[in-house]
């Protein structure tokens, strides 16, 4: 009686594990025969917006430079 209970418990545990894992305990295919539904395209990662691009320093080069504080005259800001 005790042996039968242990076998039933092990069978129930095995069935619950295979149901939760979705049958992933089976060996996976090697990937030589890809199906159309399983093909995924790799996505290129996007770089930062204001990082160094074609010009070093990004958009900073095109901003108006602040005037030096050693000038004579009214303050521009």
Swiss-Prot record:
Annotated segments matching region Disordered: 43-77
- An annotated GO cellular component: perinuclear region of cytoplasm
From the UniProt record, give one GO term of the biological process aspect: negative regulation of systemic arterial blood pressure
Xref: InterPro entries: Apelin
Q: In which tissues is it expressed?
A: Expressed in the brain with highest levels in the frontal cortex, thalamus, hypothalamus and midbrain. Secreted by the mammary gland into the colostrum and the milk.
Q: Which UniProt keywords apply?
A: Angiogenesis, Cleavage on pair of basic residues, Developmental protein, Gastrulation, Hormone, Host-virus interaction, Secreted, Signal
- Where does the signal sequence lie? 1-22
> Where is there biased composition of kind Basic residues?
58-71
MF terms from GO for this chain are: apelin receptor binding; hormone activity; identical protein binding; signaling receptor binding
Primary location:
secreted
Give the location in the cell: Secreted; Secreted, Extracellular space
Could you state what the record's PTM comment says about this protein? Several active peptides may be produced by proteolytic processing of the peptide precursor.
User: Residues at site: Important for the balance between G(i) and beta-arrestin pathways induced by apelin-13-APLNR system?
Assistant: 75, 77
Provide the propeptide boundaries. 23-41
Under Pfam families, the record lists: Apelin (PF15360)
Name the job this protein performs: Peptide hormone that functions as endogenous ligand for the G-protein-coupled apelin receptor (APLNR/APJ), that plays a role in cadiovascular homeostasis. Functions as a balanced agonist activating both G(i) protein pathway and beta-arrestin pathway of APLNR. Downstream G proteins activation, apelin can inhibit cAMP production and activate key intracellular effectors such as ERKs. On the other hand, APLNR activation induces beta-arrestin recruitment to the membrane leading to desensitization and internalization of the receptor.
Q: Which family does it belong to?
A: Belongs to the apelin family.
Q: What is this protein called?
A: Apelin
Organism, scientific name: Homo sapiens (Human)
